[in-house]
């Protein structure tokens, strides 16, 4: 009876999702058309980054699972990342959840397709009573391949582009990670990185062997001199070697799947697109996340701060991250909060000194570079001064506002300043 109830729940869920997809499909066509009209600059970069984020999160009470997610377009002319979060999975017992980050290239359609349809393929392959762990690993492998085949059937033959993907499937006993390409996941356990996915690049021995066996070449570290990743959804022009199954094509949609037995020391899992990993290592990000959790920061706000930090560190790509916190995640610490407040106060005093020592307030970039050259204690591990960019910008803006008001009163507007946004804090260097 329980199995039948779960099957009915899944059927109802599928019907609801079909209606949602019809509406989303119309919205996607409008977004794609707007994207085609967007002006193309050098490397498809904007003149200023788009920093807007809509962080969101949730919690699953029975299993102690919390998550946060956020995304930012950054300097790119188009947003090609997508993600999805499921705290519960229809048709499966409590304690199962799914999270995915997808990073598109050559357009956003493949990533959006994956975010909307890959969970359904996973559910279909799992069935109502999945066997762990090998049955689930095989189900994830089949789900990626079936989703890729479905995408091929929907796309015109002239369509180009694809996406990388990293999926975290949580069960009460295991953490399953399935990934294609360079979207990455890191597990923190007992204060250290316990597991990290490895990017699928053409020069990895296994990838190189498959590419050459399928008649392909590797030039400039890229498949056929063009594609930087060797596994992806979509990219069907690289999947036409005759007589070879999908997993043995030049570019494969077959994921690498890991099954990690859950432990009480598990703290959190961070999933992110390469716009995040390009600027900060996995170990550094894990340290930064742990330090922010000790401040009591909600996972979704923490994700937003991570993306701001990566933007300030120089990321030029779209950025998406999902933080999944387990019961063993670091808890708020009064000492950590006290030290953070002291750091903010010290930064405020130093910025005031820098502005007061000049005839007119220096630019925000000058203030930031000056602070970066100084030895400031207790900066966030892994994030450094970049993690405090928002605080610095807010303090600077307040000081300039006071200076403006004083200038208006004293010299009829003389001495006004024109503060810039830390955009992320520093102008993009040529």
Swiss-Prot record:
Membrane spanning residue stretches: none
Every PPM-type phosphatase domain range: 66-326
Superkingdom, natural source: Eukaryota
Keywords, in A-Z order: Hydrolase, Magnesium, Manganese, Metal-binding, Protein phosphatase
SMART domains associated with the record: PP2Cc (SM00332)
Origin organism lineage: Eukaryota, Metazoa, Chordata, Craniata, Vertebrata
Cellular compartments per GO CC: cytosol; nucleus
Needed co-factor(s): Mg(2+); Mn(2+)
Organism of derivation: Homo sapiens (Human)
Catalytic activity line of the entry: O-phospho-L-seryl-[protein] + H2O = L-seryl-[protein] + phosphate; O-phospho-L-threonyl-[protein] + H2O = L-threonyl-[protein] + phosphate
Region (Disordered): 16-65, 407-430
Listed SUPFAM superfamilies: PP2C-like (SSF81606), Protein serine/threonine phosphatase 2C, C-terminal domain (SSF81601)
InterPro entries on file: PP2C, PP2C_C, PP2C_C_sf, PPM-type-like_dom_sf, PPM-type_phosphatase-like_dom
Amino acids binding Mn(2+) 2: 103, 274, 317
GO MF term set: magnesium ion binding; manganese ion binding; protein serine/threonine phosphatase activity
PROSITE patterns (UniProt xref): PPM_2
Cofactor info, note text: Binds 2 magnesium or manganese ions per subunit.
One GO biological process term: positive regulation of canonical Wnt signaling pathway
Recorded coiled-coil stretches: none
Keyword Metal-binding: yes
Family: Belongs to the PP2C family.
Residues the record lists as binding Mn(2+) 1: 103-104
Compositional bias segments (type: Basic and acidic residues): 17-26
E.C. designation(s): 3.1.3.16
UniProt-recorded name of the protein: Probable protein phosphatase 1N
